[in-house]
Amino acid sequence: MAWFKRDNPPQAKGPAHRVKVPEGLWTKCVSCGETIYTKDIENNLNVCPKCNHHYRVSSKKRLELLLDEGSFTEFDAGVVSVDFLEFKDSKSYQDRIDQALAKGGSKDAIICGSGRIEGTPVQICVFDFSFMGGSMGSVVGEKITRGIERALSDRTPCIIVSASGGARMQESILSLMQMAKTSAALAKLREAGLPFVSILTDPTTGGVTASFAMLGDINMAEPKALIGFAGPRVIEQTIRQKLPQGFQRSEYLLDHGMVDVIVERSKMKSQLSSILTMLYRP
């Protein structure tokens, strides 16, 4: 049995050293489940390189992607939300505003201003979903209306990029009236023969969908964006039926005539420029 003997007895190993991986280095795609180097997603315009899932982006990033470099001028940056009704649920509305401002992004759920898209002058409003879910309150409605009015006075196209959970409940009727206010302003833009292009991104829901977001001369959408009024879960609970596969996604809306075209983020600027060239004459 000597052949079972070892010439060198096993040595006790020291404790294993774990390699510390920085947080956020890798991202697991919420769509395909692949683990991807985060920088690869960021370098791909926040789109998964494996399955083409379009992640949400900030309003500032969206402006960078759509407008010519250095052409953007922001308007109405000083208009901020006020707690008119002294609304309080689990916390006060003012506390929610302060919490959103502390994130260091936008001062409200939208940024508006003027810029150029491949040389064409435009008025543009871009929602920021990170600010209270992109909800539309009196400030959002006012800034959109002013943007439309500037497009009227300057005779330029108007573009609105939506990403919103709908009307801001903390402002009650003051938020709901923004639906009529923005729609009335767009009616004047149409009477003047100036184009309005609505870009629908994930998610576009509630009072935003039920007003200006679906009133575009051209309604564009990003792939697989959630677009609807009530959410699919609420609808299923109400009608007590299972909804069709892909219901309320941009592809479903395209098939049913609610969206004119679906455009990937990387092609959005060039496609938008082509549309403006056809619809707008300075």
From Swiss-Prot:
This protein's assembly is summarised as:
Acetyl-CoA carboxylase is a heterohexamer composed of biotin carboxyl carrier protein (AccB), biotin carboxylase (AccC) and two subunits each of ACCase subunit alpha (AccA) and ACCase subunit beta (AccD).
Give the EC number(s) under which this enzyme is classified.
2.1.3.15
Q: Which UniProt keywords apply?
A: ATP-binding, Cytoplasm, Fatty acid biosynthesis, Fatty acid metabolism, Lipid biosynthesis, Lipid metabolism, Metal-binding, Nucleotide-binding, Transferase, Zinc, Zinc-finger
Q: Which family does it belong to?
A: Belongs to the AccD/PCCB family.
Q: Give the classification, highest ranks.
A: Bacteria, Pseudomonadati, Thermodesulfobacteriota, Desulfuromonadia, Geobacterales
Species per Swiss-Prot/TrEMBL record: Citrifermentans bemidjiense (strain ATCC BAA-1014 / DSM 16622 / JCM 12645 / Bem) (Geobacter bemidjiensis)
The entry's protein name is Acetyl-coenzyme A carboxylase carboxyl transferase subunit beta
List the gene name: accD
PANTHER family recorded: ACETYL-COENZYME A CARBOXYLASE CARBOXYL TRANSFERASE SUBUNIT BETA, CHLOROPLASTIC
Ranges for domain CoA carboxyltransferase N-terminal come to 25-282
Do the record's keywords include tRNA-binding? Answer: no
Enzyme class at the top of the EC tree? transferase
Q: What are the boundaries of the C4-type zinc fingers?
A: 29-51
Catalytic activity from the UniProt record:
N(6)-carboxybiotinyl-L-lysyl-[protein] + acetyl-CoA = N(6)-biotinyl-L-lysyl-[protein] + malonyl-CoA
Which HAMAP family does the record associate with it?
AcetylCoA_CT_beta
Q: Name the pathway it acts in.
A: Lipid metabolism; malonyl-CoA biosynthesis; malonyl-CoA from acetyl-CoA: step 1/1
Among the Pfam families in the record, one is Carboxyl_trans
GO terms assigned for molecular function: acetyl-CoA carboxylase activity; ATP binding; carboxyl- or carbamoyltransferase activity; zinc ion binding
Which residues form each disulfide bond in the chain? Answer: none
Cofactor requirements of the protein: Zn(2+)
Query: Entry's Gene3D superfamilies?
Result: 2-enoyl-CoA Hydratase, Chain A, domain 1
Q: How is the cofactor bound?
A: Binds 1 zinc ion per subunit.
Instruction: State the function annotated in the UniProt record.
Output: Component of the acetyl coenzyme A carboxylase (ACC) complex. Biotin carboxylase (BC) catalyzes the carboxylation of biotin on its carrier protein (BCCP) and then the CO(2) group is transferred by the transcarboxylase to acetyl-CoA to form malonyl-CoA.
Gene Ontology terms: biological process = fatty acid biosynthetic process; malonyl-CoA biosynthetic process
The subcellular location is:
Cytoplasm
Q: Which InterPro entries match?
A: AcCoA_carboxyl_beta (IPR034733), Acetyl_CoA_COase_Trfase_b_su (IPR000438), ClpP/crotonase-like_dom_sf (IPR029045), COA_CT_N (IPR011762), Znf-ACC (IPR041010)
Where Zn(2+) binds, per the record, is at C29, C32, C48, C51
One cellular component GO annotation, for this chain's record? acetate CoA-transferase complex
